[in-house]
Amino acid sequence: MCKARPTRYAGFMRLFLLTSLTMCAFAANSILNRLAIESGASDPAGFAVVRVLAGAVVLAVLVLLKGGVLPLRSPRRIIGAGSLSLYMIGFSVAYLTLDAGLGALILFGVVQITMFAVGAMTGAAPTVRQLAGATVALGGLAYVLWPAGTVQVDALGAALMVAAGVGWAAYSLAGRSEPNALEGTAANFVVALPVTALALLVAGGTWQ
């Protein structure tokens, strides 16, 4: 019994540190995206394509080094790559009019609410923490997006970020059924690369 508490505490601290590191990485992602677009160093199309390309290359190399294969023809790629492309496109273009903090708030709120809603509709009983998280996320979104509120939000930018949040939530939910997380993720990025590039090209390619 004496050894159980330190082990449980160590597990909690490990989870806390990994979660904090993940959230910092997500926040840095928003900041770097906004800086790249606002400074003119890249347009949304170029930034999105570079992100997908980098992910595809790194993940594909990891799969090959482990002796795995890329399941590119799996039906799972329809939802996986499609939702990933939706996230990448909406996320990058939205930062033309949204600042980093506001964009991240909308994105994380929508992801939380979407995953909670899907879980509720599929019969999964929500936990107290899930209910609390969804309530906080919904309250934050309502405060930010309320038409008569004090925060001025570009409607198109907000809509694009909402779409990105739905895409990321769908991608996360679809990933739960992947038999091999690394191979499935790598395949999603590889398939999403031409989809993202083509969609942005058709949409205009360059934004001012």
Question: Can you say where each PLM-predicted feature lies in the sequence?
Answer:
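Glycine-/small-residue-enriched transmembrane alpha-helix faces in small-molecule transporters
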Residues: 2-49, 82, 86-90, 139, ...
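Helix-capping/transition residues at the boundaries of transmembrane alpha-helices
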Residues: 37-39, 95-97, 123, 175-179
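Specific alpha-helical transmembrane segments that line the substrate/conduction pathway
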Residues: 46-57, 84, 92-125, 164
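Helix-helix packing/entry segments at the starts of transmembrane helices
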Residues: 50, 84, 89, 103-110, ...
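Hydrophobic transmembrane alpha-helices of multi-pass small-molecule transport proteins
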Residues: 59, 63, 84, 126-146, ...
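Membrane-helix interface linkers and caps
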Residues: 61-79
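Loop-to-transmembrane alpha-helix entry segments
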Residues: 73, 104-108, 120-143, 151-158
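Membrane-interface helix caps and helix-loop-helix hairpins in membrane proteins
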Residues: 93-98, 146-154, 176-177, 203-208
